[in-house]
Swiss-Prot record:
Mg(2+) 2 binds at residues 10, 134. This is Ribonuclease H. It is an enzyme of class 3 (hydrolase). Its cofactor is Mg(2+). Monomer. Belongs to the RNase H family. CDD domains: RNase_HI_prokaryote_like. GO terms for cellular component: cytoplasm. Residues 1-142 form the RNase H type-1 domain. The gene is rnhA. The lineage of its organism: Bacteria, Pseudomonadati, Pseudomonadota, Gammaproteobacteria, Aeromonadales. Its EC number is 3.1.26.4.
Length: 154
């Protein structure tokens, strides 16, 4: 039986594009793990994707994951839009290249390892774990230890 993990994610970008950060909060029984990282120049959508990727990558074995995000872009992208993008060779309905394809490929790879159920929560609506992720992501975006987002612009 797979371990049941609850994962909350959020991304932040100050300027969009600008300095950004992501955060993930993972909960397994009484255990809690918080992840966050900042980047020098990125976008909000990239940070939302990175949050989900980082959370899933941090799991050392396949798990049953209840992933909650405040990003409709991430939730709809991975549950609906990705199927059409793959069929069209990573092009949109308008035949434009899919933005952030490097991260969509990573996220698609990660969800193959896990049984992921996707949930959406309205951002800044008082949900405690989403608010915590927002705080961690903003702090990461402001931190001195920001990395370079090698995929931006993609």
């Amino acid at each position: 039986m797979l371990k049941q993990i609850t994962l909350y994610t959020d991304g932040s970008c100050l300027g969009n594009p600008g300095p950004g950060g992501y955060a993930a909060v993972l909960i397994y029984k009484q255990h809690r793990k918080e992840l966050a990282q900042g980047y020098e120049l990125t976008t909000n959508n990239r940070m939302e994707l990175m949050a989900a990727i980082a959370g899933l990558q941090s799991l050392s074995e396949p798990c049953q994951v209840r992933l909650t995000t405040d990003s409709q872009y991430v939730r709809q992208g991975i549950t609906q839009w990705i199927h059409g993008w793959k069929k069209k060779g990573w092009k949109t309905a308008n035949r434009e290249p899919v933005k952030n394809v490097d991260l969509w490929l990573l996220l698609d790879s990660e969800i193959q390892r896990h049984d992921v159920e996707w949930f959406w929560v309205k951002g800044h609506s008082g949900h405690p774990e989403n608010e915590r992720c927002d705080e961690l992501a903003r702090n990461a975006a402001l931190a001195d230890s920001r990395l370079i987002d090698s995929g931006y612009p993609s």
